[in-house]
């Protein structure tokens, strides 16, 4: 067994011995041993770049049918990815799921509003964190939905005030610091509003809406094993914290764009908020319309709307995605402002968080007045929201949404420098452009066969068996395809298939004539041989001296030329211009 002190190179060699060339596992014990050691080994980025262990482990993970091994490999790769991607090391510290944020809107772990001694929150947070590490694509959603149901039951029960501190992690936000998000009020009036809309229905609608709106951002849901999917809630909370800090700098600390619940636990907390306050959730269409103080609030009410759109929750982490996220929301902002009825809470632009929130306090009373009347209106608009996935990360138009997008790789290995580096948005966009135009390529390729046949063919081409090559099925299908492409594109020139056929016809005709072999003519089969079947006579002697006697004093070739035994004979026995030189039988020197 390999010890834990083995170097990465040794572990790589051992792993290579345990798998075949197609990454299929040949020695499961050795592979498990290597992964166990790698889990304990404090590997560095340089060692990963040098050994390419990440690629090997990922290939093994894809090929293996052992679920436990695949999970361990995936977790190992995620840990390495956090090591490689700059700025990812502090992600779990700054914003783990369901850890309450500070009163000023940032997710600072040292400043909490809820006492740490409360048992239910302290249990939920580590459990969610560990689940999020392993199954960050599935488990948090299940956990959050079950916690939502529990909270709904507890909120509807008669002992609501007694259980308030236990059921909600973030309740002190409303009671302790009302102005933190620019809204006046206490939990009591907000809870009274719930009587107008059944809380269970709102909660179910939000669950359904949350499921639909996972589609919008990337247009294709990323594979759970893709290397970019780590700590999604933590990362969006990290991004929000930085944006909110910038907002505090701009506004001089007089107002806070977001309450702590928005920056710490994006999805579960805000859905609870929206269910508790039907005034914020129900009139999502009316709150966003320009008729409500639109001069003061250009974007769709940044502070009243929770920052939990799928655009923030689903976007993958890493500094490289920060720019993408910002540009996505700016793009979204321009689309949505021009269409006020569709400006919903989940499509709020990130840039709206930076705007001043003066004048928003008056809006709440207006929203409360319109809360009951706009309930049905809000539900109608919600039905159209799953269709609003017209914005992609690369900013493509809505017509391109039917075209499947390639899975984006967050990390790439540069063979020139030998380093693993994050894939910048510019590079990925250029790659997509390169892959996006495969159609003109065949017409470019057809230029080469068109130019070659008319030119004088050098000697090596004559030695190529073009006839046999042309009968090859692959070449035939390729030439037919190219010919069809040219024909369908309206080109008047002949395709490569035509030129190849013409060339082969001409070559076959040329080759047939020189194929006549230049050899010696066979000797006449004479029945009598002088000196063998009969005696030699004077006529035989005269004939030898004065006449051509094939097989006796010389021979003919197939061209009718006579060679006696003192001549050198040059023949072409195969008809391919290869010479066979025969020395004289008799040398007179």
Swiss-Prot record:
Claim: Cytoplasm is one of the keywords in the record: no
Keywords for this protein: Activator, Nucleus, Transcription, Transcription regulation
Gene3D superfamilies: Conserved domain common to transcription factors TFIIS, elongin A, CRSP70
Stored InterPro entries: MED26, Med26_C, Med26_Mid, TFIIS/CRSP70_N_sub, TFIIS/LEDGF_dom_sf, TFIIS_N
Example GO molecular function: transcription coregulator activity
Amino acid composition bias (Low complexity), ranges on this chain: 259-268
Biased composition (Polar residues): 276-297
Positions of the TFIIS N-terminal domain: 10-87
Superkingdom of source: Eukaryota
Main localization category: nucleus
Sequence ranges of Basic and acidic residues compositional bias: 190-213, 398-412, 424-435
Keyword Membrane: no
Location in or out of the cell: Nucleus
CDD domains: TFIIS_I
One of the protein's GO biological processes: positive regulation of gene expression
GO cellular component: core mediator complex; mediator complex
Ranges where the record places region Disordered: 83-233, 247-320, 363-441
Family statement: Belongs to the Mediator complex subunit 26 family.
Function comment: Component of the Mediator complex, a coactivator involved in the regulated transcription of nearly all RNA polymerase II-dependent genes. Mediator functions as a bridge to convey information from gene-specific regulatory proteins to the basal RNA polymerase II transcription machinery. Mediator is recruited to promoters by direct interactions with regulatory proteins and serves as a scaffold for the assembly of a functional preinitiation complex with RNA polymerase II and the general transcription factors.
Oligomeric form and interacting partners: Component of the Mediator complex.
Protein name listed in UniProt: Mediator of RNA polymerase II transcription subunit 26
Origin species: Danio rerio
């Amino acid at each position: 067994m390999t010890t834990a002190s083995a170097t990465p190179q040794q572990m790589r060699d051992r792993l290579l011995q345990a798998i075949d060339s197609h990454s299929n596992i040949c020695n499961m014990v050795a592979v498990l041993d290597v992964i166990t050691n790698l889990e304990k080994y404090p590997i560095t980025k340089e060692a990963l770049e040098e050994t390419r262990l990440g690629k090997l482990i990922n290939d093994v993970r894809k090929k293996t049918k052992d679920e436990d091994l695949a999970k361990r490999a995936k977790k190992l790769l995620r840990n390495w990815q956090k090591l490689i991607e700059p700025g990812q090391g502090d992600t779990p510290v700054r914003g783990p799921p369901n850890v309450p944020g500070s009163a000023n809107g940032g997710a600072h772990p040292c400043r909490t509003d809820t006492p740490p001694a409360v048992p239910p929150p302290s249990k939920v947070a580590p459990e969610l964190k560990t689940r999020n590490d392993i199954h960050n694509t599935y488990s948090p959603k299940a956990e959050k939905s079950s916690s939502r149901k529990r909270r709904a039951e507890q909120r509807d029960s008669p002992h609501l005030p007694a259980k308030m501190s236990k059921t909600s992690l973030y309740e002190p936000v409303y009671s302790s610091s009302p102005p933190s998000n620019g809204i006046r009020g206490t939990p009591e009036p907000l809870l009274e509003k719930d009587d107008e809309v059944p809380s269970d229905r709102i909660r179910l609608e939000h669950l359904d809406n949350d499921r639909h709106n996972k589609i919008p951002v990337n247009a294709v849901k990323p594979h759970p094993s893709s290397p970019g999917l780590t700590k999604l809630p933590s990362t969006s909370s990290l991004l929000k914290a930085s944006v909110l800090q910038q907002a505090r700098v701009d506004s001089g600390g007089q107002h806070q764009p977001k309450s702590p619940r928005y920056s710490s636990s994006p999805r579960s907390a805000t859905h609870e908020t929206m269910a508790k306050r039907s005034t914020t959730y129900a009139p999502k269409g009316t709150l966003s319309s320009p008729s409500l103080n639109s001069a003061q609030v250009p974007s769709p009410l940044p502070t009243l709307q929770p920052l939990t759109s799928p655009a923030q929750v689903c976007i993958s982490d890493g500094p490289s995605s920060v720019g993408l996220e910002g540009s996505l929301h700016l793009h979204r902002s321009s689309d949505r402002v021009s269409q006020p009825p569709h400006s919903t809470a989940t499509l709020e632009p990130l840039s709206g968080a930076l705007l001043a929130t003066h004048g928003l306090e008056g809006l709440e009373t207006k929203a409360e007045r319109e809360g009951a009347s706009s309930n049905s209106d809000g539900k109608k608009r919600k039905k159209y929201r799953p269709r609003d996935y017209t914005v992609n990360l690369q900013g493509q138009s809505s017509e391109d949404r039917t075209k499947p997008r390639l899975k984006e790789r967050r990390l790439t290995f540069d063979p020139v420098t030998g380093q693993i580096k994050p894939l910048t948005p510019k590079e990925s966009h250029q790659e997509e452009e390169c892959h996006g135009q495969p159609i003109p390529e065949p017409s470019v390729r057809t230029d080469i066969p068109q130019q070659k046949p008319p030119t004088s063919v050098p000697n090596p081409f004559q030695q190529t068996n073009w006839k046999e090559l042309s009968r090859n099925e692959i070449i035939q299908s390729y030439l037919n395809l190219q010919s069809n492409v040219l024909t369908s594109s309206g080109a008047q020139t002949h395709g490569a298939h035509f030129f190849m056929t013409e060339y082969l016809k001409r070559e076959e005709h040329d080759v047939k004539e020189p194929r006549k072999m230049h050899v010696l003519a066979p000797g006449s089969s004479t029945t009598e041989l002088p000196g063998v079947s009969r005696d030699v006579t004077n006529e035989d002697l005269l004939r030898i001296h004065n006449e051509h006697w094939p097989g006796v004093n010389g021979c003919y070739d197939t061209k009718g030329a006579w060679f006696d035994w003192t001549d050198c004979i040059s023949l072409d026995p195969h008809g391919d211009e290869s010479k066979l030189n025969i020395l004289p039988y008799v040398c007179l020197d």
